[in-house]
Amino acid sequence: MTDFNSLQITSVNDLPGYHAAAAFTTKSSEVFKEAEEISPRHVSDKVSYMPWGADDQMPYDIINLIESDETLSTCQMFNAEVCYGSGLVYQTDEMCKRNVVNEVEEFFLDNDMASYFLGVCQDFKHFGFAVSVIILNEQGNKVVRVLRKEACYVRFAPANKEGVIPQVLYANWRNSVRAEQVEVIPLLNPQSPWTDLQAQVKKDKRKFAVVSRVPTPDSTYYPIPYYASLFKGKWYNIKQLIGVAKEAKLKNSAPIKYHIEIAKSFWSNIFKAEGITDRVKQQERVNEEKDNIINFLTGMENSGKVLFSEFYVSPNGEEQHDVVINKIETDKEGGDWATDIIEAVNMMCFTMRVHSNLVGSVPGKSQTNNSGSDKRELYTIAQALQKPYHDLLFNVHRLIIRFNRWNGAYPDCPFIQLTTLDENKDAKQVSTEE
C-alpha cells in the first residue's frame, strides 16, 4: 500500500523555453471512487471487517483533503462547535431523588464529557457517524464509563444473515495491522439497542459499542458525507488551483498555462508494474513521469500543435485517461484572482452549510456585510439545525440513563443564543427541552 502523503505529487514545474508553468495536482473526485468490488478483509481466521473504500484509506484521504484547504477545515470546525452548543448535560427535574442527582454528578466527574462530546460532534460532521463505547461495572448493573472511538479508526464487521452488524474493530488502519493490535468490541443492534443490551449483559459482557449514524439515501456500511459534492464536483480543485497559481506568480512571475490532474491509481499502477517499493525511488519515478508530461507539452508548443485531447499521451504512444490536462487562459494578472477566490470560497461555504459572514471566510477583502441582527439570526438558525444530530447523538445517553435507573434525568444540549444590548448581556443558554 503506497503512502501518497509521503510523496510530492502536487507541484509547479516550469515549461522550458516558455514564460509559463504547469501545475500538477491529484484528482479530488477519486477519493469516493470504488475502483473495485468491496469484499471483507480478514484480520484472523475468526475476525473480518468491511474496508472503508477500495483501499481502506478513504477516511484518511478525506481528512487530508479537508486539512489541505483553509476554508474547508474552518467550516468543519465551525460546524462541530455549533453542534457542541453549550455542551452535553444530563438534566435532572424536580422528580429526581437526591441519590440520582449525586450519581449523575459523579458520572460526569469520572468521564471527560466535554472532550467526548466535541469529539463525536467532529466525527458526525466529518463522516456522518460516531461510535461511543459504554463500559459496565463488574456486577453488570451500572454503566460507569462512556468513551469515544474515533470514527476514522473504526471498521464494521460484515453484517450477519439478519442484516445486523455484530461488532466493530478499532485499530490504526493507516498501516498494516496484526490481529493483536485490533480491539474487537460487540456492537449493540442499532435498531433495538436497549433490548440487545439487556440480552448481552446476561452473557457476562461488560463493554459495548453504540453507533450514532446520520441516515443517508444510499445505505452503506460507511455513509458518504453530504459535502462529498465538493470533491466530486469542480470547486475544490478550482480553489486549490487558484492558490497554486498565486504562489507561482509570486515566486517567479510565471503564469500557470496547464493544469494536470493525476489520479492516484496512475502512480499505483506504475509502481506495481515496475516493482518500485522504495519511497525514494518512487519519488524519483514520479519526477521522471512529470518530466515526460512536461516534454509532451513543450513538444506540442514547439510544433505549434493545438491541444485537442485532454489526456496525456505517454512516450510509447498510449493515451493515459488517468492524467487529465487542462489548458488555462493566462491573461489573469496577480491581483485579478480576488473575484475568483471569493466565488470559490462562497461555493465551499454554501456546500458546508456555513454562512461566510459567520466564519470570516474572505479576510482582508471588502465585501457586503450583514447587520448584527442578521448575524444573530444566522447563528440561531445554524444551532437550531443541529436538533436532528442531537437526537441521534443522545440515543446512547438515553440508554445509559435508563440502564442506570436515573429516573427524572434526560440528556440535553443547550445552545447559546446571542442577545441584544437591551438585555444587558452578550449571550444566554436556551434549551430545546424547555
Task: Identify the meaning behind each predicted range.
Residues 295, 349, 387-434:
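C-terminal anchoring/interaction modules
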Residues 39-42, 47-49, 53-67, 274-285, ...:
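Extended, non-catalytic structural segments that build the interaction scaffolds
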Residues 89-116:
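A broadly used, surface-exposed interaction patch
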Residues 161-184, 256, 285-369, 395-408:
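Long amphipathic alpha-helical segments
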Residues 2-61, 106-303, 433:
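Structured, contiguous alpha/beta core segments that scaffold functional sites
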Residues 62, 68-69, 78, 85, ...:
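C-terminal structured domain segments
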